[in-house]
Swiss-Prot record:
It comes from Francisella tularensis subsp. novicida (strain U112). Consists of 3 domains; the N-terminus binds the ribosome, the middle domain has PPIase activity, while the C-terminus has intrinsic chaperone activity on its own. Keywords: Cell cycle, Cell division, Chaperone, Cytoplasm, Isomerase, Rotamase. GO terms for biological process: 'de novo' cotranslational protein folding; cell division; chaperone-mediated protein folding; protein transport; protein unfolding. The gene is tig. Belongs to the FKBP-type PPIase family. Tig subfamily. This is Trigger factor.
Length: 438
């Protein structure tokens, strides 16, 4: 086999690979003879079909099957011999004739080689959130609202009321698609409608009609409506007032708590603290990763981005429960491209840093992180044992420990400032970020 490096520019490289004719023809001949012993053909007994007949009828097909098997073997050896770190490959067949060498080009995308410097340029705003009894009481109040019962009342609409409405949305005086609905239930203050919509209903009474003006958010998913000033003609058809359950032993049992109200309140606070810790870690880590992407200079392999896009599509399908009749491949790649590119770039940068630094995950550190994570489950010890039996899960935990160490290492060199934030705003932002990332 002869290998010629045709061009190598950046992360792109082409290998012209030539396989001797006798090597190809020998394998093809053996496959034809093997096929002749098993194939059925009119006029011949099984195993007695002449090889020449098989070659005449199936020779081209057999040759292509042989080549399809042989090409990956040849380019894999060439890549190994040339010591190339390949991210993606496309094969272009050049010459394929009996009695002549097989020639093909392997167009490669290589993993970029780069060094990350300038960590002091990274700016991180570290969120500081104080979790007090006020936030705990508000969380319990939110839980009470989840179990609220509603009864119809004859009064003006107030916050937390459930209203049944008809509405027609208009832009520039014309009704827009998706802006009209009848008999829609809205809980005032829940944030299920765009900002300003629910506030505009407060004070209305049953049977009343009103036109309100609201502006769609700049980041609204429908670009035709993003940032647009619109009007909504609203008719209130029913008003229901919420009746919240008392926080007593019966109520806390709904959440699997057996120790009464005091235990319930303590568990709520512990859960809030645990969730807050991981969210704040994520917020800081996201800023660190963003900063790393800004200072690192390299070309991102498109094949890795495409692979990540395909994985995101499959993940979306899983989230939809494998919806029948829904082909995720029909979704445009650009819907997933930005997130996919970020993930690939972050992964490449972290790998580059880890190759130059020695970050290790000690067994005790992995165990400590596992203990912390399983506290969010109903049966922590049982969950812990299940995870420890799963090699993939344990490998992910080990990787997370190393990732946390790397993040701390970068933070020691970065410009870090603090910013006080509200607990519920942090939770809301986290939910929005998760939704935006599918």
């Amino acid at each position: 086999m002869q290998v010629t490096v045709e061009k190598k520019e950046g992360i792109h490289c082409s290998l012209l690979i030539e396989v001797p004719a006798n090597e190809i023809d020998s394998v093809v001949s053996k496959e034809i003879n093997r096929t002749a012993k098993t194939i059925k053909m009119d006029g011949f007994r099984p195993g007695k079909v002449p090889a020449g007949m098989v070659k005449k009828k199936y020779g081209e097909q057999i040759r292509m099957e042989v080549i399809s098997d042989l090409i990956p073997q040849k380019y894999s050896k060439a890549i190994q011999d040339e010591k190339l770190a390949v991210a993606g490959i496309e094969v272009e067949l050049k010459e394929n004739k009996e009695g002549q060498p097989l020639k093909f080009v392997a167009n490669l995308e290589l993993f970029p080689e780069f060094e990350v410097t300038g960590f002091e340029k990274i700016e991180v705003q570290k969120p500081v959130v104080e979790l007090t009894d006020k936030e705990v009481k508000q969380m319990i109040e939110n839980l009470r609202k989840q179990f609220a019962t509603f009864s119809e009342v004859d009064k003006a609409v107030e916050k937390d009321d459930k209203v049944t409405i008809d509405f027609v949305g208009k832009k520039d005086g014309e009704a827009f698609e998706g802006g009209t609905a009848n008999d829609t239930d809205v809980i005032i203050g829940s944030g299920q409608m765009i900002p300003g919509f629910e506030d505009g209903i407060i004070g209305m009474k049953k049977g009343e009609q009103k036109t309100i003006t609201v502006t769609f958010p700049q980041d609204y998913q429908n670009k035709d409506l993003a940032g647009a000033e619109t009007t909504f003609d609203i008719t209130v058809k029913k008003i229901q007032q919420a009746e919240l359950p008392e926080v007593n032993d019966e109520f806390v049992k709904k959440f699997g708590v057996k120790g009464g109200v005091d235990t319930f309140e303590n568990e709520i606070k512990e859960n809030m603290q645990r969730e807050l810790k991981f969210i704040l870690q994520r917020k800081v880590k996201d800023q660190v990763f963003k900063g790393l992407r800004e200072i690192a200079e390299f070309e991102t392999p498109k094949s890795l981005i495409k692979r990540e896009i395909d994985a995101a599509k499959q993940n979306l399908l899983k989230q939809m429960g494998g919806a029948k009749g829904f082909d995720v491949n029909q979704l445009p790649d650009n819907l997933f491209e930005a997130n996919a590119k970020q993930k690939v770039e972050t992964s490449l940068i972290l790998d580059s840093i880890m190759n130059s630094q020695e970050f290790k995950a000690e067994e005790a550190e992995v165990e400590s992180l596992l203990d912390e994570l399983v506290q969010a489950y109903e049966e922590p010890e049982k969950t812990k044992e299940q995870i420890k039996k799963n090699d993939k899960e344990m490998a992910n935990l080990k990787a997370l420990v190393i990732e946390n160490k790397l993040t701390d290492w970068v933070l020691e060199q970065a410009k870090v400032t603090e910013k006080t934030e509200d607990f519920f705003e942090v939770i809301k932002e986290n939910m929005q970020a998760q939704q935006a990332g599918f």
